[in-house]
Amino acid sequence: MSYPFAPRSRRRMLALGARTLGVGAAAALGLAACGTSDNRSDATETTPASNDAKDIAADAYVFGYPLVLMDVTRETGGPANQFVHQNPPTPEVRQVVRLNLDTLYSQAWLDLRPEPMVLQVPAIETGRYWLMQFLDAWSNTVHDPASTNPRVKNAPQQPPYTYLVTGPGWKGTVPEGMTQLAMPTGTTWLLGRIEYQGEADIEHVRAIQHRLKLAPLSVWNSDGVQGGPGALAASSSAPAQMVGAMDGPTFFARMCAVMAANPAHEDDVDAMKRFATIGITPGGAATVPADVLNAGLADGRRALTEYRDPKSQYQNGWLFNLEVGAYGTDYPLRAQVAALGLGANLPRDAVYPTIDGNADGDSRFRVTFAQDQLPPVGAFWSLTAYDSESYLVQNSARIYSVGHLVPLSPAEDGTITIAVQNAEPGPEVPAGHWLPIPESGRFSLTLRLYAPKDSVLNGKWEVPKLEKLS
């Protein structure tokens, strides 16, 4: 089972585009080439596509990587059309990096080919954030009903919210009281998130999870079983490792098979025509030798690990990307985000600026929000620290994030300062204002902004600097 965390094998890649590389397959596809300056402001350019079979295979790998990874993840994600709920994360977890301590996940892999599925989100108390994210088979986020905007149409504006999730080509009638969520692929990943507020809140959130309803349309509101939630399960990074172990013939055979059930988007027609020249088609088989496929796969993998995303933004040292979640024909970005961790949110739902730092003995840092300049969000925000391997920072105070659970206290001038350091700062720092980091070595901070407001998305609000005091 996989959640939208970076798998352990990718733990050095701390943010979208953070360990970025060259152009590789992007140029061969005629996509925007990447700048190489530190500020990433270089103008983009295009390069004619290569007709070499190895280059085509490399580009096909970048194109198809999210599809294959999604399919392998689906196989490890439990029975189709049933919820599986995540265990509450703990600081001792070492299988998953960059743990999210703010929400619990509920996932279901939907097979929409036989008929539509119905999802009902129960009444949840005002102020508790939730998000139901629907990804197509290519890892694009297509729908995102949430507590901040349930996105209902021709249906009651009050909970419970009932959604009819339909596959491509469905032409039935939407029952009264339901909002249709049309998906472009028969395979759909439903990834739900519900805010939880520490250990004492876990049982309450579990109760909410078990009130989520999911069932085929044919048995909805009938005597049929409503597809109750599955057992709690732990996360795993196995799918990425499994795809990483595939050779060229295996990968491209899998890609062709999955495309037969989940065709590419109509905007991908030029890429698909090019791939067809070496037999990579929906339901097809590659027509070039295995050594060419293996060489192309190796080049494609190298392209992903060397890709520099020109759309990544730097703001006072923080790195983030406002172009993720839905990718259009930006195949390198789509593949890179999938490699970092499937399930990236649309920016309107969440933005995760990340910054790296280096502690040396008694190093002290701080993050200061100016008066009335706390992160502008429609839900909530948190700041979490990670060690050099992207695990939570072990500390005797068991403080791993700030901003969400304990209210922050402004100083006399209205500013709010977070002390970022290993040593306990003492009584002069209010409760909730200390974020422990490692005593020495590399560390990173992630600022999670849930339902960011327009001022975040248009750049009018900036993340404050991480200042080193000693």
Where are the regions that the model predicts?
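Bacterial signal peptide processing site
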Residues: 35-37
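Short alpha-helical scaffold segments that flank and stabilize functional sites
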Residues: 20, 33, 60-63
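Ser/Thr/Pro/Gly-rich low-complexity linker/stalk segments immediately outside membranes or between
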Residues: 39-41
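N-terminal secretory signal peptides
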Residues: 1-30
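A compositional/structural signature for long, glycine/proline-rich flexible linkers
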Residues: 45-470
